[in-house]
Amino acid sequence: MKSEIKKNDMVKVIAGDDKGKVAKVLAVLPKTSQVVVEGCKVVKKAIKPTDDNPKGGFIKKEKPMHISNVKKA
């Protein structure tokens, strides 16, 4: 599906928990028709302990949302 939304565009979320937010697009996933929007649909992800991070823990990360849930601002 061809989309006018590109990386670094400012978009407004029109559906979902973050409805009304205006933020920047971090990534566009054309195969799945999804976008990753900065600060929207944030989830806590568990990180296993590694050599770099011996304690492990949690990080907050944006999940992709369907492109129909955003429009250019």
Swiss-Prot record:
Keywords: Ribonucleoprotein, Ribosomal protein, RNA-binding, rRNA-binding. GO terms for cellular component: ribonucleoprotein complex; ribosome. InterPro entries: KOW, Rib_uL2_dom2, Ribosomal_uL24, Ribosomal_uL24_CS, Ribosomal_uL24_KOW, Translation_prot_SH3-like_sf. The keyword RNA-binding applies. GO terms for molecular function: rRNA binding; structural constituent of ribosome. GO terms for biological process: translation. Residues 53-65 have a biased composition (Basic and acidic residues). Part of the 50S ribosomal subunit. Belongs to the universal ribosomal protein uL24 family. HAMAP family: Ribosomal_uL24_B (MF_01326_B). This is Large ribosomal subunit protein uL24. It comes from Helicobacter pylori (strain J99 / ATCC 700824).
